Structure formats: C-alpha cells, structure tokens
A protein has these predicted regions:
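Acidic/His/Gly-enriched intrinsically disordered linker/tail segments
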Residues: 39-46, 51-127
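Soluble non-cytosolic domains of exported or imported proteins
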Residues: 19-20, 24, 54, 58, ...
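Alpha-helical scaffold elements that line and support the substrate/ligand-binding pocket
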Residues: 127-139
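Beta/coil-rich, acidic/histidine-enriched accessory regions frequently appended to metallopeptidases
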Residues: 158-199
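Structural helix-adjacent loops and short alpha-helical linkers that scaffold large soluble proteins
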Residues: 72-84, 139-146, 178-183
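Terminal peptide-recognition signature
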Residues: 64, 144, 186
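Juxtacatalytic substrate-recognition/specificity segment
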Residues: 1-56
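Long, well-ordered core segments of solenoidal/helical folds
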Residues: 34, 88-98, 151-161
C-alpha cells in the first residue's frame, strides 16, 4: 500500500486473510495523522530527483504501526491478548531479523543507503515497540489521563498538512509537550539506538 497526500493505493492478494487486510488498511488510515498531517520540511515538498530524508521514520511508520494495532484492540476487532501477542511478535522479529542496534534517526536520514535499506523494515517492528513505550511513559506520568494519541493531536494542531516542522525541533517539542522522561527515552533508544530492556 502507498499513501499520498490526497489518496491511498492498496493492492492485495486474493489469498490475504481478513486480519492481515485489517492490519494494512488500519496502518494506511493512520498515515493521515503522520506523515500526511505531521511531517518535517524534509518531506513536505519531496523532491524525487534530489531526495532529502527526515530523521523521523520512527514516528511516520513506527507510531502509525502502533496505532494500527492499538486501534484494533480499542475497537474490539482483536482482544487485549491478541494485541499483546502482536507486540510480542514484533519484539521477537526485531531481535531475530535486525539484531544490530542502530540509531533510528540515523537510519532514517540515511535510508536511501543500501545498508540502511536492509534494516528499514524494522520501523514496523521495533518502531511500533518504541511508540508503545512512549505511550506507556505518557500514560504512567499522567496517571492514565493522556497517551501518545494526545501527543499526536497536539503535534497535529501545532503543525498540520501545510505547516511542516524542522527535523531538529521535533524531539525538543515532544519533550516540552509531554515529560522529560519521554525526551530521555527518545534520546536513549531512538537517537542513540541503545538496546531496550522490555522487562
């Protein structure tokens, strides 16, 4: 599937299960939030002949993938146990297929390099786990009053489809809108690429 600023194209095999179909459609739907609504200047007027990549694929794809799963449990399409199984599978795949720890911001900025293209699919695995961790931190610090969806709404209100952000300002902005612990987490695990202890 491929999203564009005014449309989405999706091609499916006839043999695709209904669960997989829901997963893909949910993911593509949440691209209306990011990157179609919240995105950086690097991708706002994307030049396919001279591409400049953003450092924030962890948000564009990871947060989107997390929302695609969270939406399904929130709407009763899957159970909480199924949601947790999906996230556990992502943890397993991230460790098995992409054992080398890497800075997600560096990978994102350099995703056109062949070496980085090989690990790009990890944004759908570890990227979703990073988003879940951010959600859990926000929920914990706010006593369950807020989550990552609230953060994305705030970013959407600040920026939007016609007002992109500077790549360098996103993490400080997220920290200001949430908690220092969120900024610390992003710095340690997304920017530095330290291994996450999910325990």
């Amino acid at each position: 599937a491929l999203e564009h600023n005014k449309s989405t194209t999706a091609v499916f095999m006839q043999t695709m299960s209904s669960n997989d179909l829901i997963q893909v459609i949910s993911h593509e739907f949440f691209h209306t939030l990011t990157p179609l609504n919240v995105h950086s200047k690097e991708i706002h007027d994307f030049d396919f002949n001279n591409p400049k990549m953003s450092a924030h694929l962890w948000m564009y794809e990871g947060v989107t993938e997390y929302f695609a799963n969270l939406f399904q449990v929130n709407q009763g399409l899957i159970s909480e146990d199924e949601f947790l199984a999906h996230m556990a599978e992502k943890e397993s795949l991230a460790g098995k297929l992409y054992p080398k720890e890497v800075s997600f911001t560096e990978m994102s900025k350099n995703v056109l390099d062949p070496e980085m293209q090989e690990i790009y699919p990890n944004v759908y695995q570890k990227g979703a786990l990073l988003a879940m961790c951010i959600d859990l931190i926000i929920r914990d610090k706010s006593n369950g009053q807020k989550g990552i969806l609230d953060l994305m709404r705030q970013l959407s209100n600040m920026y939007g489809p016609t007002k992109p952000f500077d790549d360098a300002e996103l993490i400080p902005t997220i920290t200001k809108l949430t908690y220092p612990e969120v900024g610390d987490f992003i710095q340690k695990y997304i920017v530095n690429g330290d291994p996450i202890d999910y325990a």
